[in-house]
């Protein structure tokens, strides 16, 4: 029989896969097998599954209208324009970055923007040209709520401590890909970064945590990380994904009738263990006086 562990789907993976029609919906692993379903039939049903996406159109309908026109920004400088056109060191404009952040905030309920800057060694002379060439101005990156390990807010709801992890893909000296996990702790006074057991501590010179939560809707809860209003829709999409597959399986089963054949008392009726009830097998029964016929589920 097809195996089923009963492990719940990760909430944020379900949301991401539903939005992109990828992951568990692409492979069919979102289908929950029937208790008596064979592994072969379950694999076949996964290969025949199809996904009707309701999550992405709803999210995009809310977000695309906001970014229909380029925002008007005034009183900018030449150095600030550098940042506007490249906020992450990968040539991403601020508008494009904020649209990505807003989509993920709508999908996850909240998304965190971290503001950081390269470390400049003490005594280094930074000219304007060096500032530009070495990209020594701040950069942004996103942190999903699934990466938040712990946090503390005061009685006013202000974030005063947060711990999170991010993965950073690099190439080692042998040219092989290496995934490094960075564990960050941010407070109003200091920040720490741990990589492979080595921890660095930095003074927080700005006095506030350089992380901004972006919410997909007004957060009326007391939680820094609220429940996503898209989660119920993603769960409904999951249920419909399973229902469509099950209904298609019933339709296919009814499309091919099952031959039932009566067997007399003197007929050989010993080797029947190899026969399985299904549309592709023969169903034998004893003491029947009717003629062979085809039946199908009603």
Task: Please name every model-derived segment.
Residues 1-136:
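Extended, helix-rich architectural segments
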Residues 14, 78-86, 93-97, 101, ...:
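Exposed alpha-helical structural elements
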Residues 1-31, 191-228, 240:
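N-terminal start-of-domain structural block
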Residues 199-298:
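Extended, charged amphipathic alpha-helical segments
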Residues 94-103, 126-129, 135-139, 145-153, ...:
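Intrinsically disordered, low-complexity boundary segments flanking structured domains
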């Amino acid at each position: 029989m097809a195996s089923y562990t009963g492990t719940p789907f990760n909430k944020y993976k379900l949301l991401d896969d539903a939005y992109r029609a990828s992951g568990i919906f692409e492979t069919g692993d979102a289908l929950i097998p029937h208790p008596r379903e064979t592994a072969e039939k379950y694999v076949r049903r996964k290969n025949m599954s199809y996904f009707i996406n309701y999550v992405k159109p709803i999210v995009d309908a809310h977000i695309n209208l906001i970014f229909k026109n380029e925002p008007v920004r005034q009183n900018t400088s030449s150095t600030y324009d550098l940042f506007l056109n490249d906020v992450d060191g990968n040539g991403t404009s601020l508008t494009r970055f904020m649209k990505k952040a807003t989509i993920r905030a709508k999908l996850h309920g909240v998304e965190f923007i971290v503001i950081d800057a390269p470390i400049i060694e003490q005594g280094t002379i930074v000219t304007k040209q060096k500032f530009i060439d070495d990209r020594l101005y701040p950069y942004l990156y996103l942190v999903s709520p699934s990466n938040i390990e712990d946090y503390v807010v005061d009685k006013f709801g202000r974030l005063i401590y947060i711990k999170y992890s991010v993965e950073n893909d690099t190439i080692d000296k042998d040219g092989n890909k290496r995934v490094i996990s960075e564990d960050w702790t941010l407070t109003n006074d200091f920040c720490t970064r741990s990589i492979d057991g080595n921890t660095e501590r930095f003074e927080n010179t700005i006095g506030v945590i350089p992380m901004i939560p972006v919410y997909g809707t007004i957060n009326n809860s007391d939680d820094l990380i609220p429940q996503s209003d898209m989660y119920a829709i993603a769960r409904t999409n999951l249920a419909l994904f399973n229902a469509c597959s099950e209904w298609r399986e019933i339709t296919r089963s009814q499309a091919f009738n099952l031959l039932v054949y009566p067997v007399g008392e003197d007929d050989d009726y010993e080797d029947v263990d190899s026969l399985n009830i299904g549309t592709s097998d023969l169903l034998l029964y004893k003491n029947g006086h009717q003629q062979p016929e085809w039946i199908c589920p009603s």
